[in-house]
């Protein structure tokens, strides 16, 4: 019995020494050039075009053979995808979609997915704090690749979503040499809206930083996405507050019925739209969506910002022109509800004339555009005020390319409620000319009524306008 006990003790000591030995070897493998990489918790999976879903091969800082084992392409660019906060502790469905789109656009590239799921699954404030550690991990990985393999950070493009955008920014601020580009996909707002630049994404974090803001609804600091500009170019699709196809009414109803337990699902639509807009730019390179620089979304809604002079317009997404101004450029555009998201923007200007002073508020209209390729009919718009002898400018957009404009129709829609005054007499204005500017082509056209002036009456038939025959008018508009 005593000999058996001694044998068991000896066996236990031997097993413990074996485990310690193996752990020591594993630790030794991750000490390279005197640098200890064992504190890195984030994982770096090099996904392949054949398998965009699974993390089958990991690049391990400090383990040089891991890079060869994963068939890293040293002569091509590298995309590093950093996910955001998660409730489930698992990757969301957009990750493989973005990986696949990146490989489709850049087949020879490396697409690395950063796994920080264990840290991202904590309560939001805790996960937000972890972005600093994740950023440090990513920066250490990039610097290690630069030192060990002479892989230039200028070949690296970081793409971060939500909290991942700030982790990308912190990584960019910590690398010894700047990375080429960081794309922030609706960077998280809470805990970051008022944070100093070193703790969040900022223009100094890469040679070029572009940002998409898609869910900034709410007061500053409480909106899901950050409201203030944090890049060289900040684009606010549909004003950045809420995206078409995302039902705000349904979201409010579900929160009222179920509480905030399903808030992760509710915010996904507009928050994640930033990712799908970028994916769209990768897959539909022939027709990039165009955004326009503007001081405010209110001015953009009036159609006052459809200029492309002096870098005032830019492509959304992958093919963006890398304009580095001293101040962040805030840009706006409209989109469709589904991919492809591109629309065609128009500024419309018209003067309402009359002999008697008359003012109406919140008036609904419809405009139809007819072009050489297609037409877009009954586009609704509302003017907050319509007054005699005043000129109004507003923005409309079409979901199809109608080609060169040939003709338009304008209708003043009657009120949905019954009005005795409208029953006896319908208000109206004279409109002589309508000026239209196409944002995508930058062409301007002036339309005239078939008579000298067209009388537009509320609730009556549409009025037709055709291209003015006076060449001097259209020459001035060019």
From Swiss-Prot:
UniProt KW keywords = Calcium, Cell membrane, Chylomicron, Disulfide bond, Extracellular matrix, Glycoprotein, Heparin-binding, Hydrolase, Lipid degradation, Lipid metabolism, Membrane, Metal-binding, Nitration, Secreted, Signal, VLDL
Q: What is this protein called?
A: Lipoprotein lipase
CDD domains (UniProt xref)? Pancreat_lipase_like (cd00707), PLAT_LPL (cd01758)
- Its gene is LPL
Description of how activity is regulated: The apolipoprotein APOC2 acts as a coactivator of LPL activity. Ca(2+) binding promotes protein stability and formation of the active homodimer. Interaction with GPIHBP1 protects LPL against inactivation by ANGPTL4.
MF (Gene Ontology) = apolipoprotein binding; heparin binding; lipoprotein lipase activity; metal ion binding; phospholipase A1 activity; triacylglycerol lipase activity
Q: Which Pfam families match?
A: Lipase, PLAT
Lineage of the organism? Eukaryota, Metazoa, Chordata, Craniata, Vertebrata
Membrane listed as a keyword: yes
Which N-terminal residues, if any, form the signal peptide? 1-27
Under which EC number(s) is this enzyme classified? 3.1.1.34, 3.1.1.32
Q: Where in the cell is it found?
A: Cell membrane; Secreted; Secreted, Extracellular space, Extracellular matrix
Q: List the disulfide bonds.
A: 57-70, 246-269, 294-313, 305-308, 448-468
Q: What is the membrane topology noted in the UniProt record heading this document?
A: Peripheral membrane protein
- Region of interest called Important for interaction with lipoprotein particles, as start-end residue ranges on this chain: 420-424
Q: Which residues carry this modification: 3'-nitrotyrosine?
A: 124, 194, 346
Region entry Interaction with GPIHBP1, spans: 35-56, 446-470
Q: What class of enzyme is it?
A: hydrolase
Active-site residues, Swiss-Prot/TrEMBL: 162 (nucleophile), 186 (charge relay system), 271 (charge relay system)
